[in-house]
């Protein structure tokens, strides 16, 4: 029998503990968990000991001057966009030249005859990024694009497109990318978070909205899938009184699992609030007065369906609320106007009496009228609270302060092997 071939000896590992060298035609297979995409898995030919990668053009295109950091989440509406906004500002404050992009667009609007991603537009504007630091979204994830892909009408090779569009950014120190809503979203187009991270050789930071101690399970699962690409996590929306307990339980546990906890962000009512203008849009409401105060922020919802004495006690316990009540419940409307109310939403499309409108004008409280019943109105408002965005200037200031106080930017820079003293070009 012949002597078995000598096993291939892997090259010396990359010096960075978080970003191993991407595979090339001379390097062995590099695996980041069980979810590495087919394009980067090597084929082992029969009777050969060495591996021959089938996807080699990536490493040739990677610009050496910019690294990639992908911000993702374990579930939608975890605070990913807010984290991106706050983090990018901290990076700029450290003197780093940052580029930004969102490969999969979900919040699209039409501007000047073309579709733009609203999050990209807003964050780029907040950071004063020049055009060459903004990478357009590749794909709008909506019903139409999904149908086209499922019917086979869209045969685009998004992996190739991702390389061509995102790996040509040779300027700046860091390309900060906002990932999909969870680890699976985008898989239909080969653009899930693990796939994107693998293709562009990106480090990953995940944002997780805290719900209970069992929130660690989704992070452990993500670690299994992403492996060493996952360089850290941010635990968001934690009740302030529970943060000390998390520092003694979840933080050390995750660190033992080689998951760096870069920040534990306290729950903040302002960041979970919605503007009156957003409620007008979602409810298709008519504004009866104070259309100039639609920028007021609503932090809670109250339903005026009880007697007036109970309503007064109920309203006094709440702050910055939207009150939903029937257009014929004048006594409830009056009680709401004398408490911490940001807007009054009247159902049934019944107009309020003139003295209610006059008092609302004096107190600068918008009154909205909707052609809906109370239950449907409450459901829409609740859903709006569950899909909060950070497109108001007051929220930008808030998230910057939260991140500056509760996020370990120095540790992130160390994990990325970036120097805060780097000079801008």
Which role does the model predict for each range below?
Residues 72-78, 82-156, 165-166:
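N-terminal phosphate/diphosphate-binding loop that engages ATP/GTP or pyrophosphate donors
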Residues 147-189, 194-198:
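Phosphate-binding/switch loop-helix module in NTP-utilizing enzymes
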Residues 68-69, 97-99, 121, 173-175, ...:
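Structural motif
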Residues 164, 259, 264-326, 382-425:
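Non-catalytic interface/targeting segments
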Residues 180-259, 328-390:
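Conserved catalytic-core segment of NTP-binding enzymes
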Residues 39, 55-73, 77-78, 92:
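Extreme N-terminal, non-catalytic leader segments
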Residues 1-59:
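Short, C-terminally biased terminal segments at protein or domain edges
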Residues 63, 168-171, 312-321, 336-340:
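Flexible, charged surface loops at secondary-structure boundaries
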